[in-house]
Amino acid sequence: MLTLTPTYDRPWRQPAEWWPRLAAATDGIDPPFGVLSLEALAANAHDMLERAQGTPIRVASKSVRVRGVLDAVLALPGYHGILAYTLPEALWLAETHDDVVVGYPSVHRAAIAQLAADEKLASRVTLMVDSIAHLDLIDAVVAPDKRATIRLCLELDASYHAPVLGHLGVRRSPVHTPEAAGELAAQIVKRPGFALVGMMGYEAQIAGLGNRGAGKAVIRMMQKASAAELRERRGAAVAAVRKVADLEFVNGGGTGSLESTHADESVTEIAAGSGLFGPLLFDGYEHFRPAPAASFVLSVVRRPTADIATVLGGGWIASGPPGQDRLPRPVWPEGLSYLPREEAGEVQTPVTGAAARDMQVGDRVTFRHVKAGEVSEHLDEFVVVSGDEIVDRLPTYRGEGKVFL
């Protein structure tokens, strides 16, 4: 298993030396593959702990999708448990981990039946709910008297209803007020076959929205106001739910909100994962800057003109509102850019720039992805580099034959 030892060197701050070093270490491997710097991963993991200031971090698996990385991070004091994104994934991870919360409601009937039939799995996995309809579906799959007790987490809507701008954040739970949370909790605890053990609220408008630069002053103001509003509302909602349920945990936040979520006394743990890989998305944040721990490498397969080199693959567009900010970025060799009329393609991606003129068929281009775990869906493995050497090769979920979404 990888050991994530703290490091005080920051070689990635010299990109003209950093990227060639990683490229040289992996020169004998055929693309496409991911590259994971052990030092950068360790620095990010420890930086997140410092930012959380003692609040335990539950690792968001969707932002990693590499079991070897999950294992290494969870071995560090300060990290505990996994926030999975589907129930089939959670059941798979629960074979070796004893605390897995599914971050989204599940209606996967076969997986629910598997969970309900296994006391050990049922003790390790917690399902997310935000309405009685979720309980009804579970009961329809397996009756309460014919299954193990199902652990539940109630999700609170953590979005911000701004005075002028309206709804800010993501559309998740319909449970927005403390009153609604208390009412749903009261209904849940009356239902046989269930145990309400947790609460969750994800403040995407704070954790997932870049705020760096003079043009982002309004966003920073909104985030400050949202954090204050949520701290009061979430605290009241947790208090309302605790009147009827003995909660084991209250989960909040994400990599981008570790500081503000820690300041909420009602929160007992923070969910985070993207900061481990340090994707492009976080280059746009003012209050922290993770190391670019994860990258991916593609091969040059064509030279259509003297100014253009074409790599195989590349169109690994990040989720979210479509735009230029969702494209992977070529980072080595320096100075490469996309063609405006073609950009990143499904099977081939032409790049241009001064460096493209010197590239030959068989050369490589290193890219960074906008998001963290999404790149793992395109790769079989990450090659782990420490210093100038390959120290491990870790399969992604895809490399292990698993595709959950």
Predicted regions and their residues:
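Glycine-rich tight-turn/loop motif centered on a GG-T
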Residues: 26-37, 99-102, 120-127, 166-175, ...
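Active-site-proximal beta-alpha core segment in soluble small-molecule metabolic enzymes
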Residues: 60-203, 208
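Active-site loop/helix belt of alpha/beta enzymes
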Residues: 158-279
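Active-site loop ensemble at the mouth of alpha/beta enzyme cores that anchors a bound cofactor
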Residues: 214-226, 235, 256-334
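C-terminal accessory subdomain/extension
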Residues: 303-405
